[in-house]
């Protein structure tokens, strides 16, 4: 049958799937209640997606750091996702008109809008399947809020630290975040990429948008910017993935636990981009190797790639192909690990679940999905450690940030590097 790929919104031919809508539709209530009771205590979450800042009021009315400057902003940058069904159309339009992630050439704007309009109803159906919207904003707010509480204790010299969200394709958008920074009297801002592994199509696209909006608003010199541009080997991140895998392994009978194959699944990338030297592929490999080292290589593992779009070659092997081929060889027990994501969203809650249902229909009954790091305090502590090191090092970005891909011909890439070199 023809299935609509939920993550990249393209049609692809697959085997039939079972109806698991009700299970995913209960995701929000079940997951969030477990989080509040069992993992950590957090303040109540407001679903108002237009609010860009999370718990932004400085403690005890403080509006300046001990250095006499304004608060330090930590801006959580990500693709984002529609928080409700009404946001799906605008989300798709922003996505398909962005040449950094989906290049359509001369007809980028008109063709992108056309594609978005045609696909909106189908994509809305997929978001309905997971509860009516993406949980990515919810988890990003929790991560940012808890991280900044830790930063206030670790780095009193730059406190208070205020968490903000800047999504590329869904509210809260980059331009709204900049207005909120101004209102909060921010002096220094850290652009914290929520893509642990760098790709020009993800981290690069978000920073390109930040540059554009700073110029459009005439805010180039309003804030002192620095960038956490990649963190594939951050120990808190590695430990959080490992802990989630260990918890899932415990759900298997003890006598088969060591035989479970761990499948690290990341969003795929066109081979044309890989051939240019985009570092994403080897940074994904670095993360998965580090996780397996933390697990003492007790299980076999495979790197796989999901969400391919169109007929051109993309990174392989595809995640669903890996599941099927291993299953054909008698391997029934596998754990799918979304290794490139810091929170659950449509690609984990819908696409990976579809793969699991496909596998069950083929008799591959032991495939399970590991949750993203979401509200893991291990990961959040790691984020705080990372940003604290960044603040104390007083460097604008990593050494690798100014290294363009050997085959890069993108003007926006060169403009991004030149722009942030001035800070």
Swiss-Prot record:
Catalytic site residues? Answer: 385
What stretch of residues directs this protein to its organelle as a transit peptide? 1-40
Q: How is the cofactor bound?
A: Binds 1 [2Fe-2S] cluster.
Lyase keyword on record: yes
The residues the record assigns to binding [2Fe-2S] cluster are: 200, 405, 408, 413
Pfam families with a match to the protein in the record: Ferrochelatase
Its annotated pathway reads: Porphyrin-containing compound metabolism; protoheme biosynthesis; protoheme from protoporphyrin-IX: step 1/1
Q: What is the E.C. number? A: 4.98.1.1
Names of required cofactors: [2Fe-2S] cluster
Report the domain of life of the source organism. Answer: Eukaryota
| GO terms (BP aspect) | heme biosynthetic process
Give GO cellular component annotations, separated by semicolons.
cytosol; mitochondrial inner membrane; mitochondrion; nucleus
Looking up Gene3D superfamilies in the UniProt record yields: 3.40.50.1400
So what does this one do?
Catalyzes the ferrous insertion into protoporphyrin IX.
* Name of the protein: Ferrochelatase, mitochondrial
**Species, as recorded:** Schizosaccharomyces pombe (strain 972 / ATCC 24843) (Fission yeast)
């Amino acid at each position: 049958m023809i299935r609509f790929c939920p993550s990249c919104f393209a049609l692809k031919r697959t085997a039939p799937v079972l109806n698991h809508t009700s299970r995913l539709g209960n995701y929000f209530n079940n997951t969030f209640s477990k989080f509040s009771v069992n993992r950590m205590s957090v303040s109540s979450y407001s679903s108002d997606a237009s609010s860009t800042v999370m718990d932004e009021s400085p403690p005890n009315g403080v509006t300046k750091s001990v250095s006499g400057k304004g608060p330090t902003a930590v801006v959580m940058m990500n693709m984002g996702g529609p928080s409700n069904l009404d946001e799906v159309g605008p989300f798709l339009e922003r996505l398909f008109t962005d040449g950094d992630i989906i290049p359509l050439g001369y007809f980028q704007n008109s063709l992108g809008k056309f594609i978005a309009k045609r696909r909106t109803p189908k994509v809305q159906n997929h978001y309905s399947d997971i509860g009516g919207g993406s949980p990515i904003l919810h988890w990003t707010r929790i991560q940012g809020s808890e991280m900044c509480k830790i930063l206030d204790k670790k780095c009193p010299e730059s406190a208070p630290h205020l968490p903000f969200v800047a999504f590329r394709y869904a509210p809260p958008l980059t331009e709204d975040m900049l207005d909120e920074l101004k209102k909060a009297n921010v002096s220094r801002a850290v652009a914290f990429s929520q893509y642990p592994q760098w790709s020009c199509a993800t981290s690069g696209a978000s920073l390109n948008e930040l540059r554009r909006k700073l110029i459009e608003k005439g805010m180039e010199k309003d804030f002192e910017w620095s960038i956490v541009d990649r963190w594939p080997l951050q120990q808190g991140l590695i430990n959080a993935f490992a802990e989630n895998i260990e918890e899932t392994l415990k759900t298997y009978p003890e006598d088969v636990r060591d035989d479970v194959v761990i499948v690290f699944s990341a969003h795929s990338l066109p081979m044309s981009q890989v051939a240019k030297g985009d570092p994403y592929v080897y940074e994904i490999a670095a993360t998965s190797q580090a996780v397996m080292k933390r697990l003492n290589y007790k299980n076999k593992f495979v790197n796989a790639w999901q969400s391919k779009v169109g007929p051109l070659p993309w990174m392989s092997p595809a995640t669903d192909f890996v599941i099927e081929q291993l299953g054909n060889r008698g391997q029934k027990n596998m754990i799918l690990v979304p290794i490139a994501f810091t929170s659950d969203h449509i690609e984990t809650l819908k696409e990976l679940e579809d793969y699991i249902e496909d596998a069950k229909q083929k008799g591959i009954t032991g495939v399970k999905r590991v949750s993203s790091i979401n509200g893991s305090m291990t990961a959040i502590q790691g984020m705080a450690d990372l940003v604290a090191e960044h603040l104390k090092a007083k460097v604008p970005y990593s050494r690798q940030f100014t290294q363009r891909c050997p085959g890069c011909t993108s003007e926006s890439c060169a403009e991004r590097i030149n722009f942030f070199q001035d800070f």
